[in-house]
């Protein structure tokens, strides 16, 4: 039941609707829907629509075995997204390719809940929860995106993954055989967004960070990173598979248009991105493993921003008492070509 308005150049719908489709493909005629995603689709609930505006109340969207319930408001003209949604998926294997060997990590239920509001000036998430047998993610907060001060921003997050190898076959990457835990707590204070806690634990490695960011429109970031022991060796296989995947999708060489805009041709760190922020980072690591020989008491200070990359100081010791120190810069010249010194 509902009302259909055809007045003027902006048709509109409103009412209590019950819609169903036995498959997606007839609805998406411009693309080929993979067989594993060809599932019945249904919706029921209070909804209104007109060009650039959708408002759903107490809606229920069913897509195969997945149910999504809640409220959703999309206002393109007002650049606003409001949502209060809950989703359940009994088993992810329902969305795996039928002819492939199903990764054990797929055979899990997923519960998801999120509510908040997103505008051009602010991201606000009151609730974010994702639960499965392999991982749990929770968080909330507000982040200001405009203005010259952080007045009312705060972010908390807790991410726990039992074993990263569960995601290797899902993403076709070689994740290390170890757990991962990340805890984040940030709050605005004196016009700055202060990193009060950032703790990362994975396997035998630990990493903590504190610092602050000023000016939401053009962030100026100061970050202090500290670690008792950081072992890079479990992550090399992941980096290799990620680089191979990127190479396969983009080609062996950067294209002619994107390469000149990059500070380092093989990495997507563009001059445009560097002009949007300034970061001063100090890193202290008591023991760094994963290189040909372990390094001790690593201390570096690196500035990154519109001028490029500047290594103000870098110092490390080896197990025999040797000490190495260096400084350097990677800065674009007047024509935008990076110069290493």
What is the predicted role of each segment?
Residues 1-57, 62-194, 205-314, 322-341:
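Membrane-proximal interfacial segments on either side of biological membranes
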